[in-house]
């Protein structure tokens, strides 16, 4: 996919991007609610093995991203961009969670992906150049 920049930071896509996969990671309370069976996974402690909420939120984001990659049957190297947001509305948890994947991140603020309070990371990828050996 050919892309070009517009101005200093904007990207214009030659083809429309599309959502390949998504995953959701929630806490115990969300898993017990009416949509509980729709979430991919949850943690009984809400801390996901971490000592602070902020670190736990990063783990939730990373887990959601890894699960979305697995569902799409792609590796981080095959993904051009990742779009993600978090309830902190600062992108801290999202950037902490996605950092190790080394995928360029577009942080989304005031994310309202679903009408319930849960973490939902939408993994977006675009058709790769044929010389990369991957056509998504």
Task: Label each residue range with its predicted role.
Residues 1-108:
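Conserved "HGTGT" condensation-loop signature of ketosynthase/thiolase-family condensing enzymes
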């Amino acid at each position: 996919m050919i892309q070009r920049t517009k101005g200093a930071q904007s990207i214009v896509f030659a083809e429309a991007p599309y959502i390949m996969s998504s995953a959701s990671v929630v806490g115990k309370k969300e898993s017990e609610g009416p949509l509980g069976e729709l979430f991919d996974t949850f943690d009984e402690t809400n801390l996901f093995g971490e000592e602070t909420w902020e670190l736990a939120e990063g783990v939730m984001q990373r887990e959601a991203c890894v699960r979305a990659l697995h569902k799409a049957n792609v590796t981080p190297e095959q993904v051009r961009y990742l779009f993600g947001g978090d309830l902190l509305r600062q992108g801290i948890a999202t950037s902490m969670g996605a950092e190790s994947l080394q995928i360029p991140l577009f942080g989304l603020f005031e994310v309202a992906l679903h009408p319930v309070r849960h973490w939902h990371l939408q993994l977006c990828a675009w058709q790769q150049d044929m010389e990369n050996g991957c056509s998504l």
